[in-house]
Amino acid sequence: MARRRKGRPIDGVILLDKPTGMSSNDALQKVKRLYFAEKAGHTGALDPLATGMLPICLGEATKFSQFLLDSDKRYRVIAKLGERTDTSDSDGDVVETRPVNVTLETLEACIEKFRGESDQVPSMFSALKYQGKPLYEYARKGIEVPRESRKITVYEITLHRFEGEEVEMEVHCSKGTYIRTIVDDLGEMLGCGAHVTMLRRTGVAKYPYENMVTLEQLNELVDNANRDGVAPREVLDPLLMPMDTAVEDLPEVNLIADLADMVMHGQAVQVLGAPTEGQLRLTMGEERRFIGVGEMNRDGKIAPKRLVVFRDEE
């Protein structure tokens, strides 16, 4: 007897504007319930304090969420100088207070030092795991554990405002960059300490900022649909972006039907003119239907790596 599905097989990416005070997983579960989705996953957690872009993958799109985890991010951050907290943000307790004697010239010079590649040691208050447990679980018990530094790249860091003890910046960075750690390090460089008071993610990969929707907007759409006798999916599904937007930076290889069928059955295929290495976005036919991601193997063939499972429309 077939197991009954819990949810419907809906595929795509919704760009949620996560509210402050909510964990990324809580936001994910709310979206999953609204869409009555069979599967859902987010593409990189935001701190509860933070707001902004949280791409949520539904259905088959979850297979490609790793590509968004690995993508560049953009943030706007406000930092308060003169106070250091145990979490490096305003959710934590103040552990040190120092006078602020910072000039604009000194601030700009210190900010400039973060540009480029560097080694960053993650905060103890992060979701990274040590011996199977998130670091923040140790931190909340006052336990500090060893953390390995990680290579990060800050492509752009721009000072937008410096008023009194407040600093507002915009950061374009690689995956795995902790903005709280940048702010904490900046405070130490300035000799006064600092912590994050506002953090907003404004960009993930190339997703457009204007396509974000809030939970309030989604709930309102559902309420209006129910009131008007319309199925919620009719108003929610048009907000989804295609699942292949998660891999749009990969080179495309368009396959004829016979080769696509071979790939969908797990076989590697030879394609003239295909790139000689790396991962590829695979499409099929004149309509360029996305079928998954392949990778060039040692034999110069395209081997399937992650494939879309197509289901009958329900």
From Swiss-Prot:
The active site consists of 47
**Superkingdom per UniProt:** Bacteria
**Can you say what this protein is called?**
tRNA pseudouridine synthase B
State the similarity comment. Belongs to the pseudouridine synthase TruB family. Type 1 subfamily.
- Entries under CDD domains matching the protein: PseudoU_synth_EcTruB, PUA_TruB_bacterial
> Is-annotated flag, keyword ATP-binding?
no
Biological processes per GO annotation = mRNA pseudouridine synthesis; tRNA pseudouridine synthesis
What the entry lists under SUPFAM superfamilies is as follows: Pseudouridine synthase, PUA domain-like
> What keywords tag this UniProt record?
Isomerase, tRNA processing
* InterPro entries linked: PsdUridine_synth_cat_dom_sf, PsdUridine_synth_N, PUA-like_sf, PUA_sf, tRNA_psdUridine_synth_TruB, tRNA_sdUridine_synth_fam1_C, TruB_C
Reactions mediated catalytically: uridine(55) in tRNA = pseudouridine(55) in tRNA
**Annotated Gene Ontology MF terms?**
RNA binding; tRNA pseudouridine(55) synthase activity
Task: Sum up the protein's function in the record's words.
Answer: Responsible for synthesis of pseudouridine from uracil-55 in the psi GC loop of transfer RNAs.
The Enzyme Commission number assigned here is 5.4.99.25
Please report a single Pfam family linked to this protein. Answer: TruB-C_2
Q: What is the lineage of its organism?
A: Bacteria, Pseudomonadati, Pseudomonadota, Gammaproteobacteria, Vibrionales
Write down the species.
Vibrio vulnificus (strain YJ016)
